[in-house]
């Protein structure tokens, strides 16, 4: 899918190039769960998944951004793209060797921005342009590279972001959730890049929220641990 996205970009069909990357992100969110359900996980599959992620969320977005925005920056533009691709590679490598010994409450958070989200974030200037947003007042030579670099380093940071892996949905709200999903995808089909732009804005706003939430839960668990140790000392 990543190579297909690059092909679309070469043909200057940037709408399809972005849609291909978003489609790859959706598949990436489902393939692991499906593999676990059918008990089809393997080390080879894990490595192949990382390889395809590297192309879809590393090489393809970097190529699109260089082709559209950074080619005029010369060597600096190429360096920006190299930094981003390296950050994606480091993130995927870290994910592959990540230990499963972390406390269960940490499963609700990623360390840093995941590579699918990072790919969509770095494409934000193009997505905003396709949604009809007026980008004329923006100084591309400063704002876009700065945003690109920040996103790159968020990929390899330890900044906690929501993983949405273990969301508990009350049964009584299931019908409303299904309605919301249908409505979202219906609007996505009609106002594709406007809805994607809004989704990006919501995700960016959730980054500091997830950090504060993480710190709150971490402090709570630390206090509980101290309390348990005090109770144990009292017993002894």
Region locations from a protein language model:
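Membrane-embedded alpha-helical segments that form the functional core of polytopic membrane enzymes
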Residues: 1-47, 78-88
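Juxtamembrane membrane-interface segments at transmembrane alpha-helix termini
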Residues: 30-37, 89-97, 157, 208-220
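Juxtamembrane helix-capping/reentrant segments at transmembrane boundaries
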Residues: 35-54, 102-113
């Amino acid at each position: 899918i990543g190579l297909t996205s690059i092909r679309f970009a070469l043909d200057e069909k940037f709408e399809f190039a972005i849609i291909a990357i978003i489609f790859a992100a959706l598949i990436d969110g489902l393939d692991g769960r499906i593999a676990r359900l059918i008990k089809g996980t393997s080390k080879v599959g894990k490595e192949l998944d990382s390889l395809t992620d590297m192309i879809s969320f590393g090489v393809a977005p970097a190529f699109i951004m260089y082709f559209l925005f950074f080619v005029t920056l010369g060597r600096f533009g190429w360096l920006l793209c190299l930094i981003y691709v390296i950050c994606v590679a480091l993130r995927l490598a870290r994910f592959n060797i990540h230990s499963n010994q972390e406390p269960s409450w940490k499963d609700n958070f990623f360390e840093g921005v995941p590579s699918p989200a990072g790919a969509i974030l770095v494409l934000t200037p193009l997505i905003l342009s396709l949604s009809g947003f007026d980008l004329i007042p923006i100084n591309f030579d400063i704002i876009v590279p700065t945003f690109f670099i920040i996103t790159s380093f968020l990929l390899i940071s330890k900044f906690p972001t929501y993983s949405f892996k273990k969301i508990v949905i009350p049964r009584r709200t299931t019908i409303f959730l299904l309605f919301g999903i249908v409505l979202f995808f219906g609007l996505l089909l009609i106002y594709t890049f406007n809805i994607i732009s809004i989704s990006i804005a919501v995700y960016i706003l959730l980054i500091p929220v997830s950090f504060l939430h993480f710190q709150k839960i971490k402090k709570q668990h630390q206090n509980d641990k101290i309390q348990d140790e005090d109770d144990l000392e009292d017993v002894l």
